[in-house]
């Protein structure tokens, strides 16, 4: 038997951060069975190594258990893949005539400086996140790791939305303030003396446990429905997870959020988004956006946040002056609308920009596009390479 396994990175296992035990997926167990029964085994994947050496060593143990058995320790072990792995990159692939099979990929980092108002907002939100992160760490150390992780996750998302766009951070702060204010009123109704500072079980909210690792695990095999449900649950955690343990503490946090909202709203109304200015410059650059015959090139813009997607859709539509110049795909896009957006982007010469979250990756032929802009950095940097 000579089994050949495609998408072999799915045969994954990892060490538990709590117990140190190996958690094996069903696919990993299948790989172990194949490695023990097959004469030869070929594992194939186009997904880059995620950078976790201990997990990579577990994966390589499917090919040579003797060499890679045992937990990896930084500075002690080295994952030597000699004789077992061949790495091929697109840049090395040639036609039968010896010419490059794919055009050269040119990647650039576009730098920009924050305006004074943006800098002020950035520093104030960062101070808020830093303070609350300290509270979250104390909660975890006290034994409530799930709640501490949720608060840490919520604050991390806020920081990422701050970096995404003025619209994303403003809407996130507004939703969080509204949900926490509602929570405060609910607690006051069931508390005999709201001024006593009695410790309340704010962790009683039924929130799913979230961590950054779960966002990193989203990939091309995640279904539309799973992604939409995941994003909805994540938003719930971002809106509600708080380190406040008393009513006075919750009031203080709400007051801080109200101040941040005023600053964010002022930045949004000034309409001086330096990051957008750089994207607008790219869209105006004829050499980038049009080919030699003057026809418009296709452009994909990836963002991580739905609020930023809507914000950019309005900006780019106004820039081109046509509603049909832009199509969008995100986790909540219905399957039939997703298909229609892909067809318009691929075949309609007037539709030149696809705005998308990672949900667009499934079933989309990115070769049709000429230019790709990563407006935000994804949770898992490997996604940039996969795109």
Predicted regions and their residues:
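Catalytic acidic motif of RecA-like/P-loop NTPases
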Residues: 9-16, 48, 307, 360-361, ...
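Inter-lobe coupling linker of SF2 helicases/translocases
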Residues: 1-49, 54-206
């Amino acid at each position: 038997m000579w089994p050949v396994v495609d998408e072999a990175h799915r045969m994954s296992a990892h060490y538990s951060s709590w117990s140190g035990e190996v958690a094996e997926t069903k696919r990993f167990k299948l790989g172990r069975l194949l490695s023990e029964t097959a004469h030869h085994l070929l594992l194939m994947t186009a997904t880059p190594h995620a950078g976790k050496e201990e997990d990579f060593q577990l994966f390589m143990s499917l090919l040579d258990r003797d060499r890679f058995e045992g937990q990896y320790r930084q500075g002690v072990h080295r994952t030597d893949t000699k004789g077992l792995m061949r790495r091929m990159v697109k840049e090395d692939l040639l036609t039968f005539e010896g010419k490059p099979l794919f055009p050269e990929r040119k990647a650039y980092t576009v730098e920009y400086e924050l305006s004074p108002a943006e800098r002020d907002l950035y520093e104030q939100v960062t101070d808020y996140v830093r303070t609350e992160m300290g509270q979250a760490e104390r909660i975890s150390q006290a034994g409530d790791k799930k709640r501490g992780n949720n608060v840490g996750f919520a604050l991390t998302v806020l920081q990422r939305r701050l970096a995404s766009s003025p619209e994303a951070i403003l809407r996130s702060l507004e939703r969080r303030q509204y949900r926490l204010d509602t929570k405060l009123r609910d607690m006051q109704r069931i508390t005999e003396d709201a001024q006593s500072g009695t410790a309340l079980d704010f962790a009683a909210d039924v929130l799913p446990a979230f961590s950054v690792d779960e966002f990193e695990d989203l990939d091309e095999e995640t279904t539309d429905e799973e992604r939409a449900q995941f994003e909805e649950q994540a938003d719930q955690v971002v809106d509600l997870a708080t380190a406040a343990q008393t009513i006075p503490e919750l009031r203080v946090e709400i007051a801080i959020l109200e101040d941040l909202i005023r600053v964010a709203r002022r930045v949004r109304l000034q309409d001086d988004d330096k990051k957008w200015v750089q994207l607008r410059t790219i869209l105006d650059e004829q050499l980038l956006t049009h080919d030699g015959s003057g026809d418009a090139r296709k452009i994909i813009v990836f963002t991580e946040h739905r609020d930023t997607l809507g914000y950019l859709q309005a900006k780019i539509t106004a820039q081109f002056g046509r509603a049909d110049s832009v199509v969008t795909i995100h986790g909540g896009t219905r399957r039939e609308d997703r298909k229609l957006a892909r067809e318009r982007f691929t075949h309609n010469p007037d539709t030149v920009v696809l705005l998308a979250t990672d949900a667009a990756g499934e079933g989309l032929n990115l070769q049709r596009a000429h230019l790709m802009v990563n407006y935000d950095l994804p949770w898992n940097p490997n996604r940039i390479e996969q795109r």
